[in-house]
Design a protein with these regions (language model features):
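A short, structured active-site edge motif that brings together acidic residues
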Residues: 68-81, 106-110, 162-165
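Acidic-and-aromatic substrate-binding clefts and catalytic sites of carbohydrate-active enzymes
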Residues: 50-59, 79-85, 110-117, 141-142, ...
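Conserved residues at the C-terminal ends of beta-strands
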Residues: 9, 50, 107-110, 137, ...
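N-terminal binding-site loop/beta-alpha segment at the start of enzyme catalytic domains
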Residues: 1-71, 127
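Beta/alpha (TIM)-barrel catalytic core signal, keyed to glycine-rich beta->alpha loops juxtaposed to Asp/Glu
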Residues: 112-227
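Conserved, mostly hydrophobic/aromatic
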Residues: 8, 39, 47, 62, ...
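Short, acidic/polar
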Residues: 23-39, 83-100, 115-120, 141-148, ...
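Acidic (Asp/Glu)-rich catalytic clusters
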Residues: 2-3, 41, 62-71, 93-100, ...
Length: 227
């Protein structure tokens, strides 16, 4: 169910204003749906999203498309370091309403804040059948180990880690996180693998052009290797 090598990201799915500001261009809802259907028809069924993607419209689009073959990966994002009991459940219930579904295939702790409290809530929701698998995103090795320890106590597997990784961003390979995932049979999901198109020869636009401009220096060693 959750074993897939290519994940369809939906960070740019949303209103035209969001896409234009973030990436300098936008596509219609109809085009997004056609793209999703094409991906599913070719075996790419896992779609990764979050409540804050597309100014909140990304998840609503997924629910509106109502594609039964689509597998959904979404996230709980704690915007405050202070934990509030029930915050994970409240967020998931909103997500499920957006998706018009009774469960999500994978639920990630988007930021490693109040790890134990948030994962314990996820464990309850997992047992209730509202979550198919649990992961943690944007974490370091020690935080990943803590997450595994917490879930091991609950006899629930840590499904995966989702971090930034590409040819020019290999921090998690260098510091041992990727190897740890392999040794513990934990999936490692990489986001921004093409660096917003930089690794395909495209130039990012919109806000992304500012974010990725500082990374162009990292491309120089790659250019030398490629000749």
């Amino acid at each position: 169910m959750t074993d897939t090598t290519i994940i369809i990201g939906t960070n740019s799915w949303g209103g035209s204003l969001y896409s234009k500001i973030l990436r300098g261009s936008s596509v219609s809802k109809e085009t997004i749906k056609q793209t999703a259907e094409l991906a599913i028809n070719n075996g790419f069924i896992m779609f990764d999203t979050a409540r804050n993607y597309g100014f909140g419209k990304s998840q609503k689009l997924i629910g509106e498309f109502a594609l039964p073959e689509m597998k959904i990966s979404t996230k709980f994002t704690p915007f405050s370091k202070k934990y509030k009991p029930g915050q994970v459940r409240k967020s998931l219930e909103k997500d499920l309403k957006d998706f018009n579904r009774k469960f999500v295939d994978i639920y990630w702790l988007h930021l490693p804040m109040s790890i134990e409290e948030n994962l314990m809530e996820m464990a309850i929701l997992y047992r209730e059948g509202k979550i198919g698998a649990i992961g943690i995103s944007n974490c370091n090795l020690e935080e990943a180990k803590l997450a595994k320890e917490i879930l091991d106590r609950e006899q629930i597997p840590l499904y995966g880690i989702q971090n930034h990784y590409s040819l020019i961003e290999r921090t998690w390979e260098q510091n041992g996180l990727v190897e740890w995932c392999v040794n513990n049979n934990i999936k490692f999901w990489a986001w921004a693998v093409l660096e917003e198109g930089m690794l395909t020869g495209s130039t990012p636009s919109g806000v992304m052009s500012l974010i990725y401009r500082r990374r162009t220096k990292k491309l120089q060693p790659l250019y030398k290797v490629m000749g």
